[in-house]
Amino acid sequence: MGKRLIIQRRGRGTPAHRVASHRFKDKIRYRSYDALEKEGSIKGIVTDIVHDPARTAPIAEVKFENGEKKFILAPESIQIDDEIECGISAPIKFGNTLPLAEIPEGTPIYDIENTPGDGGRFVRSSGTYASLITHDANQSVVELPSGELKYLNPRCRASIGVVAGGGRKEKPFLKAGNRWHAYKAKGKKFMTVRGVAMNAVDHPHGGGNRQHPGRPTTVSRHAPPGRKVGSIAAKRTGLKR
């Protein structure tokens, strides 16, 4: 009798394959888009900067003047006891949050909303920023880090600056174990052995005197879980000629 594949074990959802979400700090969203921000601004003080296992960038805890506490993505150069401001009348300063219509063209921005009040959707990874290309009364054009141009509502909010944690990819992992721990923190699947390198008891592509699948790698979408490996329900395989 063969062994269960890794996809079968992960699909069962045992603790070994679940995301350790109980260690995550909080959902990072802007405060509610209320009259304070639409008509003026609200100030807050950075009380702490912490690491969140759920994301690549550090997060800052902010206590606003109305007593509300929120976690925000920390921009570069922010420090504890710094003051930030959110709202239509906030100054153009790193860490402040304003509607796109109030931000000058060419300003680096991050944590951009897709629709007004959704809390932030784009440009949230460490070291990233977007550029505000142009805007008019009906739409604002933002260039994302990928080079894609995004046409957004001018009332969508964004933060001024660059997300902290830049240069993260420049530091090598050095050991496979370090990368394993990084993947484990987010519940990702770490690198595993290829099926053709396994024994026949471990994988449908295993066994034989040399490494080869030994059978067609295209399988039906209705195949049972133990056989659903390779090109699943593929319309075509190989190079397109």
Curated annotation (Swiss-Prot):
Keyword Transcription among UniProt keywords: no
InterPro entries: NA-bd_OB-fold, Rib_uL2_dom2, Ribosomal_uL2, Ribosomal_uL2_arc_euk, Ribosomal_uL2_C, Ribosomal_uL2_dom3, Ribosomal_uL2_RNA-bd_dom, Translation_prot_SH3-like_sf
A cellular component annotation (GO) from this entry: cytosolic large ribosomal subunit
Keyword tags: Ribonucleoprotein, Ribosomal protein, RNA-binding, rRNA-binding
GO molecular function: rRNA binding; structural constituent of ribosome
Region named Disordered: 201-241
Superkingdom in the source lineage: Archaea
Subunit comment: Part of the 50S ribosomal subunit. Forms a bridge to the 30S subunit in the 70S ribosome.
Purpose: One of the primary rRNA binding proteins. Required for association of the 30S and 50S subunits to form the 70S ribosome, for tRNA binding and peptide bond formation. It has been suggested to have peptidyltransferase activity; this is somewhat controversial. Makes several contacts with the 16S rRNA in the 70S ribosome.
HAMAP family: Ribosomal_uL2_A
PANTHER family in the cross-refs: LARGE RIBOSOMAL SUBUNIT PROTEIN UL2, RIBOSOMAL PROTEIN L2
Family classification: Belongs to the universal ribosomal protein uL2 family.
The protein's name in its UniProt record: Large ribosomal subunit protein uL2
Native source species: Methanobrevibacter smithii (strain ATCC 35061 / DSM 861 / OCM 144 / PS)
